From Swiss-Prot:
Protein name: Ribosomal RNA large subunit methyltransferase H
Keywords, sorted A to Z: Cytoplasm, Methyltransferase, rRNA processing, S-adenosyl-L-methionine, Transferase
GO cellular component, as recorded: cytoplasm
Organism of this sequence: Actinobacillus pleuropneumoniae serotype 3 (strain JL03)
Keyword field contains Cytoplasm: yes
Entry function: Specifically methylates the pseudouridine at position 1915 (m3Psi1915) in 23S rRNA.
Length: 155
């Protein structure tokens, strides 16, 4: 199983890249974790946001291919570390790749939300999208460590 984090936006600050890569490199070879960046549509005062969301959504779903789509969205379901670890095990047993979708400034397209098999809420707060990349990477690594009795996660 491969985990793909599919996110709208490129050219993130250095701290985002460093933070994400710190956890990305820790994943085992049998569970690769990769980042796919989708270019954000050009936004301006007269931008057609509905059209931009639709284009970003199509690109995200194309990148996901046949993978299991999981959206990161405020109205999604919050998971504890233990619940995420159980979810990770279920995904591994399913055998399909898992594609976690992070939208842009206006969130995810309706098509992405409709395609999602699950929706995960990190917080009821609106979080900066660059920060979400690092939080997701750390959370998934922590969940993996729990499933393998690795000492990273402590009760």
């Amino acid at each position: 199983m491969k985990i793909q984090l599919i996110a709208v936006g490129q050219k993130m600050p250095d701290w985002v890249k460093v933070g994400f890569e710190e956890y990305q490199r820790r994943f085992p070879k049998d569970m690769p974790f990769e980042l796919i960046e989708i270019p954000a549509g050009k936004r301006g005062k007269n931008a057609d946001i509905k059209r931009i969301l639709e284009q970003e959504g199509k690109a995200m779903l194309a990148a996901a291919g046949k993978g299991k789509v999981v959206t990161l969205d405020i109205p999604g379901k919050p998971w504890t570390t233990e619940q995420l670890a159980s979810q990770l095990e279920a995904w591994k047993n399913d055998g399909r790749d898992v594609c976690l979708l992070i939208g842009g400034p206006e969130g995810l397209s309706p098509e992405c939300k409709a395609a999602a098999e699950k929706s995960w809420s990190l917080s009821p707060l609106t979080l900066p999208h660059p920060m979400v990349r690092v939080i997701v990477a750390e959370s998934l690594y922590r969940a993996w460590s729990l499933t393998t009795n690795h000492p990273y996660h402590r009760e």
